[in-house]
């Protein structure tokens, strides 16, 4: 009986107590985006398969951020639309296949030519 209790407790820790079925010790990821479009406010709308984070209007040189826990299967994906003036762009702001292991605190600068990831393995990407 004791072995069954230990196994049940282990599965509870592993799958039952964290957001998205993750253990409580699984590190959260923060995505921060800074509006460097060049003047107009930037309207950001981010989603995953499970969550719609809503619409946010971010003034020039200001930030918008959100926090989540990536899943164990490296399939977490958050995609965002970006709108300013008459421009409408989109980008996968967090793709576990690309970003997991590179950033837990993912800093992005949103520019007219595309988003740029800062930090280790800094890189600018084209819009989708």
Curated annotation (Swiss-Prot):
Residues 1-20 form the signal peptide. It holds the Pfam family Self-incomp_S1. Keywords: Secreted, Self-incompatibility, Signal. Its main location: secreted. InterPro entries: Self-incomp_S1. GO terms for biological process: rejection of self pollen. It is found in: Secreted. GO terms for cellular component: extracellular region. Belongs to the plant self-incompatibility (S1) protein family. This is S-protein homolog 5. It comes from Arabidopsis thaliana (Mouse-ear cress). The lineage of its organism: Eukaryota, Viridiplantae, Streptophyta, Embryophyta, Tracheophyta. The gene is SPH5.
């Amino acid at each position: 009986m004791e072995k069954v209790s230990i196994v049940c407790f282990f599965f509870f820790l592993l799958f039952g107590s964290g957001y998205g079925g993750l253990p409580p010790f699984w590190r959260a990821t923060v995505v921060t985006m800074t509006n460097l479009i060049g003047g107009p406010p930037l309207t950001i709308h981010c989603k995953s398969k499970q969550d719609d984070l809503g619409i946010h209007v971010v003034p020039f040189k200001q930030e918008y951020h959100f926090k989540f826990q990536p899943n164990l299967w490296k399939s977490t994906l958050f995609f965002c639309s970006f709108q300013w003036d008459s421009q409408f762009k989109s980008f996968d702001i967090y793709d576990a296949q690309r970003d997991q292991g590179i950033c837990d605190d993912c800093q992005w600068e949103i520019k007219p030519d595309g988003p740029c990831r800062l930090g280790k393995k800094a890189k600018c990407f084209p819009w989708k």
